[in-house]
Amino acid sequence: MYRDIAEIRQFYHSPLGALTVAHLHKCFREFWPDFDTTDTPLVGAGYAIPYLNKQGASLAVMSATMGGVRWPGTGPNRAVVTEDHLLPFAENSVERLLLIHAVENADYLREMMSDAWRVLTPNGRILIVVPNRRGWWSRI
Protein backbone atom coordinates (compact mmCIF):
# COMPACT_ATOMS: atom_id res chain seq x y z
CA MET A 1 0.00 0.00 0.00
CA TYR A 2 1.01 3.64 0.28
CA ARG A 3 4.13 4.46 2.24
CA ASP A 4 4.42 8.14 1.37
CA ILE A 5 1.94 10.91 2.08
CA ALA A 6 2.39 12.36 -1.42
CA GLU A 7 1.07 9.11 -2.94
CA ILE A 8 -1.94 9.07 -0.63
CA ARG A 9 -2.77 12.71 -1.39
CA GLN A 10 -2.46 12.03 -5.12
CA PHE A 11 -4.92 9.14 -4.78
CA TYR A 12 -7.45 11.26 -2.89
CA HIS A 13 -7.26 13.99 -5.55
CA SER A 14 -8.23 11.45 -8.24
CA PRO A 15 -11.80 10.50 -9.28
CA LEU A 16 -11.37 7.11 -7.60
CA GLY A 17 -10.23 8.83 -4.42
CA ALA A 18 -13.31 11.08 -4.42
CA LEU A 19 -15.52 8.02 -4.88
CA THR A 20 -13.73 6.30 -2.02
CA VAL A 21 -14.30 9.26 0.31
CA ALA A 22 -18.01 9.35 -0.55
CA HIS A 23 -18.39 5.61 0.03
CA LEU A 24 -16.47 5.58 3.30
CA HIS A 25 -18.37 8.63 4.60
CA LYS A 26 -21.55 6.60 4.10
CA CYS A 27 -20.02 3.66 5.97
CA PHE A 28 -18.81 5.93 8.78
CA ARG A 29 -22.33 7.35 9.23
CA GLU A 30 -23.58 3.79 9.79
CA PHE A 31 -21.09 3.43 12.64
CA TRP A 32 -21.42 7.04 13.89
CA PRO A 33 -24.79 8.44 12.66
CA ASP A 34 -23.69 11.97 13.61
CA PHE A 35 -20.28 11.62 11.90
CA ASP A 36 -20.66 14.83 9.85
CA THR A 37 -22.79 16.85 12.25
CA THR A 38 -21.48 16.45 15.78
CA ASP A 39 -19.30 18.91 17.64
CA THR A 40 -17.54 16.00 19.34
CA PRO A 41 -13.85 16.20 18.47
CA LEU A 42 -12.60 13.50 16.12
CA VAL A 43 -8.96 12.51 16.02
CA GLY A 44 -7.88 11.01 12.71
CA ALA A 45 -4.61 9.09 12.70
CA GLY A 46 -2.71 7.82 9.68
CA TYR A 47 -4.03 9.90 6.80
CA ALA A 48 -7.59 10.86 7.73
CA ILE A 49 -7.68 14.39 6.32
CA PRO A 50 -10.27 13.67 3.59
CA TYR A 51 -12.64 12.44 6.30
CA LEU A 52 -12.19 15.17 8.90
CA ASN A 53 -14.48 18.16 9.31
CA LYS A 54 -12.51 21.32 8.57
CA GLN A 55 -14.95 23.45 10.58
CA GLY A 56 -15.20 21.10 13.56
CA ALA A 57 -12.83 20.27 16.35
CA SER A 58 -11.04 17.55 14.42
CA LEU A 59 -7.32 16.87 14.72
CA ALA A 60 -5.08 15.04 12.24
CA VAL A 61 -2.20 12.87 13.44
CA MET A 62 0.23 11.72 10.76
CA SER A 63 3.07 9.24 10.97
CA ALA A 64 6.64 10.49 10.79
CA THR A 65 7.35 7.51 8.54
CA MET A 66 4.85 8.68 5.90
CA GLY A 67 5.40 12.39 6.40
CA GLY A 68 2.91 15.12 7.14
CA VAL A 69 1.12 18.10 5.72
CA ARG A 70 -0.40 21.24 7.17
CA TRP A 71 -4.15 20.95 7.75
CA PRO A 72 -6.45 22.67 7.15
CA GLY A 73 -5.04 24.81 4.37
CA THR A 74 -6.25 28.02 6.02
CA GLY A 75 -6.62 29.00 9.64
CA PRO A 76 -4.84 27.49 12.63
CA ASN A 77 -2.97 24.25 12.00
CA ARG A 78 -4.67 21.18 13.51
CA ALA A 79 -2.21 18.54 12.30
CA VAL A 80 0.72 16.92 14.04
CA VAL A 81 3.41 14.48 12.92
CA THR A 82 4.55 11.85 15.40
CA GLU A 83 5.70 8.26 15.61
CA ASP A 84 2.83 6.03 14.49
CA HIS A 85 2.62 4.27 17.86
CA LEU A 86 2.77 7.40 20.05
CA LEU A 87 -0.40 9.47 20.02
CA PRO A 88 0.31 12.92 21.52
CA PHE A 89 -2.72 12.97 23.82
CA ALA A 90 -3.33 12.46 27.51
CA GLU A 91 -4.78 9.23 28.82
CA ASN A 92 -8.60 9.05 28.50
CA SER A 93 -8.76 12.24 26.41
CA VAL A 94 -10.09 11.14 23.01
CA GLU A 95 -13.77 10.35 22.57
CA ARG A 96 -13.60 9.35 18.90
CA LEU A 97 -10.60 8.01 17.01
CA LEU A 98 -10.42 7.16 13.31
CA LEU A 99 -7.43 5.11 12.13
CA ILE A 100 -7.12 5.09 8.34
CA HIS A 101 -3.91 4.54 6.36
CA ALA A 102 -2.39 3.80 9.74
CA VAL A 103 -2.57 0.09 10.51
CA GLU A 104 -1.32 -1.17 7.15
CA ASN A 105 1.76 1.04 7.43
CA ALA A 106 2.50 0.58 11.13
CA ASP A 107 5.94 -0.64 12.10
CA TYR A 108 4.75 -1.17 15.69
CA LEU A 109 1.14 -2.32 15.37
CA ARG A 110 0.77 -3.76 18.87
CA GLU A 111 2.09 -0.54 20.40
CA MET A 112 -0.19 1.54 18.14
CA MET A 113 -3.27 -0.36 19.28
CA SER A 114 -2.19 -0.12 22.92
CA ASP A 115 -1.72 3.65 22.62
CA ALA A 116 -5.08 4.05 20.88
CA TRP A 117 -6.69 2.24 23.82
CA ARG A 118 -4.75 4.45 26.26
CA VAL A 119 -6.05 7.75 24.85
CA LEU A 120 -9.69 6.66 24.43
CA THR A 121 -12.17 7.78 27.07
CA PRO A 122 -14.04 4.99 28.91
CA ASN A 123 -16.97 5.40 26.48
CA GLY A 124 -14.76 6.36 23.55
CA ARG A 125 -15.13 4.78 20.15
CA ILE A 126 -12.53 3.77 17.61
CA LEU A 127 -13.03 3.05 13.93
CA ILE A 128 -10.19 1.26 12.15
CA VAL A 129 -10.13 1.12 8.35
CA VAL A 130 -7.83 -1.57 6.98
CA PRO A 131 -7.55 -2.68 3.35
CA ASN A 132 -7.95 -6.32 2.47
CA ARG A 133 -4.42 -7.41 1.57
CA ARG A 134 -5.83 -9.90 -0.94
CA GLY A 135 -8.30 -7.44 -2.45
CA TRP A 136 -7.80 -5.29 -5.52
CA TRP A 137 -7.39 -2.12 -3.42
CA SER A 138 -4.03 -3.41 -2.19
CA ARG A 139 -2.80 -3.60 -5.79
CA ILE A 140 -3.61 0.00 -6.75
Show which residues each predicted segment covers:
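A short acidic, Gly/Pro-enriched loop at the edge of an enzyme's catalytic core
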Residues: 85-97
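Surface-exposed loop/turn positions
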Residues: 38-39, 93, 124
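A short glycine-rich, Lys/Arg-flanked "PGG" loop and its adjoining helix->strand segment in the class I
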Residues: 110-125
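A short SAM/SAH-binding and catalytic strip from SAM-dependent methyltransferases
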Residues: 95-110
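Conserved class I S-adenosyl-L-methionine
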Residues: 125-140
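Class I SAM-dependent methyltransferase Rossmann-like catalytic core
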Residues: 1-34
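Class I SAM-dependent methyltransferase SAM/SAH-binding core
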Residues: 26, 30-87
